[in-house]
A protein has these predicted regions:
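Short beta-strand elements of solenoid repeat domains
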Residues: 18-22, 44-48, 69-74, 96-100, ...
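Structural signature of tandem-repeat unit edges
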Residues: 1-14, 24-40, 51-66, 76-92, ...
């Protein structure tokens, strides 16, 4: 069923959370004149819009948005997404932002200001069609949660994490779990001094042939369950320097 919002006056709207969630909305051209200048909440705005194939939000004013949690979650059929004009300088949560965007091949985050983001858990989870992702330049200095961030990105061959600041991160559980196509991932510069959760961090990385975790500070880690489970092509991994004094689960 068509949802025509082309005539809406949204100049005073502050909350657009769940606005089109689980609806038949599919015409992004209706949003060309949307005034989003006062909006602070866009959580789940387009979540479960399974009829949506293309979405152009380049004209959205997101300068006051704080919450983008699950904004595009489970847009199963969306092949094109334009968020090139997004101002994310006030955003604190991008949790599950693109989760289950199964056929989306590219996400352009160039210009994203993520300096205030604290939660990136599950951000790209199950983006099955994405073959490469460059998050170089993304400011992660305030992020505390990266659990399942790249979980299930099965087609991902190349993942560039240059400059990733993980100094404040406490949870990396399942961060790369299920990235079955990745042959190598450079985490040698990761600061893991505050991390408590590493369970399933590399679980199911079937193609992973090299991994340098020799510099990991694991002094605060309590859970390493299945950390390298299913890494069948990984012939060696140096964990000789791991401090497991606080670990309660090594299953």
């Amino acid at each position: 069923r068509d949802i025509d919002v082309s005539g809406f006056d949204t100049s005073n709207v502050t909350n657009m959370g769940y606005m089109f969630c689980n609806s038949g909305f599919h015409k992004s051209e209706d949003l060309r004149n949307f005034d989003t200048s006062k909006v602070t909440n866009m959580a789940d705005m387009f979540a479960w819009c399974v009829c949506l194939e293309s979405l152009d939000l380049s004209g959205f004013d997101t300068s006051n948005v704080v919450n983008m949690t699950e904004m595009f979650d489970s847009c199963y059929n969306m092949t094109s997404l334009n968020i090139s004009g997004f101002d994310t300088s006030k955003v604190t949560s991008m949790r599950y932002m693109f989760r289950d965007c199964n056929v989306l091949r590219k996400i352009n985050m160039k210009g994203f200001n993520t300096s205030n983001v604290t939660d990136m858990s599950g951000m790209f989870q199950n983006c099955d069609a994405m073959t490469s992702l460059n998050v170089t330049g993304i400011d992660t200095s305030h992020v505390t949660d990266m659990a399942h961030m790249f979980f299930g990105c099965r087609s991902l061959k190349k993942l560039v994490l240059t400059g990733f600041d993980t100094s404040g991160v406490t949870d990396m559980s399942g961060m790369f779990s299920g990235c079955t196509g990745v042959t190598s991932v450079d985490v040698s510069s990761f600061d893991t001094s505050k991390v408590t959760g590493m369970s399933g961090m590399f679980r199911g990385c079937l193609s992973l042939t090299s991994l340098d975790v020799s510099g990991f500070d694991t002094s605060e880690v309590t859970d390493m369950n299945s950390m390298f489970y299913g890494c069948t092509k990984l012939t060696s991994v140096n964990v000789s320097g791991f401090d497991t004094s606080k670990v309660t689960d090594l299953g």
